[in-house]
Amino acid sequence: MEEKNIYQPYLMRVAAIIDETPDVKTFRLEFINEEEGKNFKFMAGQFGEYSVFGEGESTFCIASSPTREGYIECTFRKMGRVTKALASREIGDTIGFRGPYGNTFPIDQWKGKSLLFVTGGIALPPLRCVIWNALDLRDNFKDITIVYGARSVNDLVYKHELEEWGKRGDVKLITTVD
């Protein structure tokens, strides 16, 4: 099998958009080439280059869990030219994705241990992938505690997931606001 050119982006379809806050969005991206999607593998903690053709590319973590195949998710704050262009995309639009790149969380080494995740604001997306990875493999770990804070209630990302995690009987969730 021919190896993928790391400089050639995968073509991705924006399948879903969640407005997390007024300036933060989450995109669910599906591979336009289904075969590429079936063969795509990544590990919790890796990142990618997300591109809007004609505007440039920006680097974000892959915010979804590798246990959930067929799509990837990214969460970003609208800040500069590229993220503003990304934020203007609509469901069905095409963007580019290069990756996965970078180091990973050593989740296999954590088996049988208690896990503590501490994060704040827009720094939750890099941990979200490993949190969902651990929750999808829940029997492998002892206690799971998530401590998450933000400047205000309006700045909390993944509110729907925070609510879900808080209702689970097998996770301790602590949220704070300044």
Q: How should each PLM-predicted stretch be described?
A:
Residues 2-93, 150-152, 178:
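Ferredoxin-reductase
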